């Protein structure tokens, strides 16, 4: 070890010093002299430095002054929700067409006669739809008619179209109204003559496929009912896209009831229609679960039946709602029917006064709708008559001045078809 060695022990520094021998002799140590050397002084042990005192931790910051929480203020009421946006405006109705065009759905009795009447009155038919009849068969069915005779013009088919008096008519064979491409033939007014699509929802399939308006040729459960000469002015082009032309019997009864009620007042009444048989009946006895009597042979029987025609008058003449009801007898004749209206009058009137009131209406505001006759007529005399109602002055009777029976004839096919076309033209005139 050198003269100065430093030993680090437990972090304590000890310094050792070796002094020379105190012996006076010059010999090298160890010295042989007997001199007793004093023991070396104990090594100085340095005291370890006192540990450094760590500075005391800083005093914690004084707590923030406690702020007493403010009493919660009542929250202001939330602002009212914004008003709901207005509903989108309805789609604008199609622009008025320059010419009335007609489509016919269903080429049965009424469908074919509507086409005949359109040809007579110069109304252009652009399409006929019937899934069960092809153009060749349409020619035959339109040309020959056992009740109204042979069509006097020309009828043929060409390139899949029906051609009547050189007018080409498109033929479609779609099963559902929504499938018929009415938009491809110029958005016509559609005559719904199948007897199937009677409600607004069912008939609106025509609208979705391009029809401008729809006239249902039967009473409807919910469509507005319009009878020419009675309430056609109730037609609203802005809201009515599907309307009903009511039934042939309602078209006969309503004009007569309107005249009598406006002039004398009807307290109550019962109607009976003696009605020609129709295609819904059986030629011989057959099954008819809903109407057992209706299943009996039409040519062999007088068959009592129900009808809603009298009650329907209350829909077109609201003042008579609940005052009329009626029934029908189906009889073995192919066409022309007759209404018997038995009613109690509010104002006493002679039968002569009643006849004069009906005669004046037939010559005036109801000309072409209501007719008057004093001839000794029978049903076939009115086959092909275009009026809705022909008052038979010689057939009616009166019990007294307040209780009368009134009789009026109607061609339930041809007269009704004329009213369908008249309603088409009236509705079209309201769009201009």
Swiss-Prot record:
The enzyme's E.C. designation: 1.2.1.12
Active site: 248 (nucleophile)
Subcellular location: Cytoplasm
Residues that, per the record, bind NAD(+): 109-110, 130, 175, 197, 217, 412
Compositionally biased spans, kind Pro residues: 56-67, 75-95
The organism's place on the tree of life at top rank: Eukaryota
GO terms classed as biological process: flagellated sperm motility; glucose metabolic process; glycolytic process; spermatid development
Tissue occurrence: Expressed in both head and flagellum of epididymal sperm.
UniProt catalytic activity: D-glyceraldehyde 3-phosphate + phosphate + NAD(+) = (2R)-3-phospho-glyceroyl phosphate + NADH + H(+)
Sites annotated Activates thiol group during catalysis: 275
Residues annotated for D-glyceraldehyde 3-phosphate binding in this entry: 247-249, 278, 307-308, 330
Post-translational modification Phosphoserine, affected residues: 350
UniProt pathway: Carbohydrate degradation; glycolysis; pyruvate from D-glyceraldehyde 3-phosphate: step 1/5
Record key words, sorted: Cytoplasm, Glycolysis, NAD, Oxidoreductase, Phosphoprotein
Gene Ontology annotations for the cellular component aspect, listed alphabetically: acrosomal vesicle; cilium; cytosol; motile cilium; sperm fibrous sheath; sperm principal piece
Cross-referenced CDD domains: GAPDH_I_C (cd18126), GAPDH_I_N (cd05214)
Biased composition regions of type Basic and acidic residues, renumbered to the chain: 44-55
Primary location recorded for the protein, binned into one broad class: cytoplasm
Record-linked InterPro entries: GlycerAld/Erythrose_P_DH (IPR020831), GlycerAld_3-P_DH_AS (IPR020830), GlycerAld_3-P_DH_cat (IPR020829), GlycerAld_3-P_DH_NAD(P)-bd (IPR020828), Glyceraldehyde-3-P_DH_1 (IPR006424), NAD(P)-bd_dom_sf (IPR036291)
GO molecular function: glyceraldehyde-3-phosphate dehydrogenase (NAD+) (phosphorylating) activity; NAD binding; NADP binding
Region (Disordered), start-end ranges: 40-101
Task performed by this protein: May play an important role in regulating the switch between different pathways for energy production during spermiogenesis and in the spermatozoon. Required for sperm motility and male fertility.
Family statement: Belongs to the glyceraldehyde-3-phosphate dehydrogenase family.
Subunit-level organization: Homotetramer.
Entry comment, domain topic: The testis-specific N-terminal extension mediates tight association with the cytoskeletal fibrous sheath of the spermatozoa flagellum, possibly via interchain disulfide-bonding of Cys-33 with sheath components.
Protein name (Swiss-Prot/TrEMBL): Glyceraldehyde-3-phosphate dehydrogenase, testis-specific
Gene: Gapdhs
């Amino acid at each position: 070890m050198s003269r100065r060695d430093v030993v680090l022990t437990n972090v304590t520094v000890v310094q050792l010093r070796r002094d020379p021998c105190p012996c006076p002799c010059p010999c090298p140590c160890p010295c042989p002299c007997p001199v007793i050397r004093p023991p070396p002084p104990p090594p100085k042990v340095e005291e370890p430095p006192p540990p450094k005192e760590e500075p005391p931790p800083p005093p914690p910051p004084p707590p923030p002054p406690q702020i007493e929480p403010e009493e919660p203020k009542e929250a202001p009421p939330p602002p009212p929700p914004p008003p709901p946006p207005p509903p989108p405006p309805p789609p604008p109705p199609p622009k008025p067409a320059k010419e009335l065009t007609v489509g016919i759905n269903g080429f049965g009795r009424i469908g074919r006669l509507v086409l005949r009447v359109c040809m007579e009155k110069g109304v252009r038919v652009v399409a006929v739809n019937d899934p069960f009849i092809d153009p060749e068969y349409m020619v035959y069915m339109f040309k020959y008619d056992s009740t109204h005779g042979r069509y006097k013009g020309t009828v043929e088919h060409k390139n899949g179209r029906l051609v009547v008096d050189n007018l080409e008519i498109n033929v479609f064979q779609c099963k559902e109204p929504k499938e018929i491409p009415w938009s491809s033939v110029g958005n016509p007014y559609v005559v719904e003559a199948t007897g199937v699509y009677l409600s607004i929802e069912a008939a609106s399939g025509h609208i979705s496929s391009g029809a401008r308006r729809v006239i249902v040729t039967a009473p409807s459960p919910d469509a507005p009912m319009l009878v020419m000469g009675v309430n056609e002015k109730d037609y609203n082009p802005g809201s009515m896209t599907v309307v009903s032309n009511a039934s042939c019997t309602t078209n006969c009864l309503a004009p007569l009831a309107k005249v009598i009620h406006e002039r004398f007042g009807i307290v109550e009444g019962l109607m009976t229609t003696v009605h020609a048989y129709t295609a819904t009946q059986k030629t011989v006895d057959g099954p008819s679960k809903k109407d057992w009597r209706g299943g009996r042979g039409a040519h062999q029987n007088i068959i009592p039946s129900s009808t809603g025609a009298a009650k329907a008058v209350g829909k077109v003449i609201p003042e008579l709602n609940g005052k009329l009801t009626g029934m029908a007898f189906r009889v073995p004749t192919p066409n022309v029917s007759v209404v018997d209206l038995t009613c109690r009058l509010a104002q006493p009137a002679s039968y002569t006064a009643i006849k004069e009131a009906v005669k004046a209406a037939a010559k005036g505001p109801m000309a072409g709708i209501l007719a008057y006759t004093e001839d000794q007529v029978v049903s076939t005399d009115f086959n092909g008559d275009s009026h809705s109602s022909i008052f038979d002055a010689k057939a009616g009777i009166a019990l007294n001045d307040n209780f009368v029976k009134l009789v009026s004839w109607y061609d339930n096919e041809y007269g009704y078809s004329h009213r369908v076309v008249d309603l088409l033209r009236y509705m079209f005139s309201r769009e201009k």
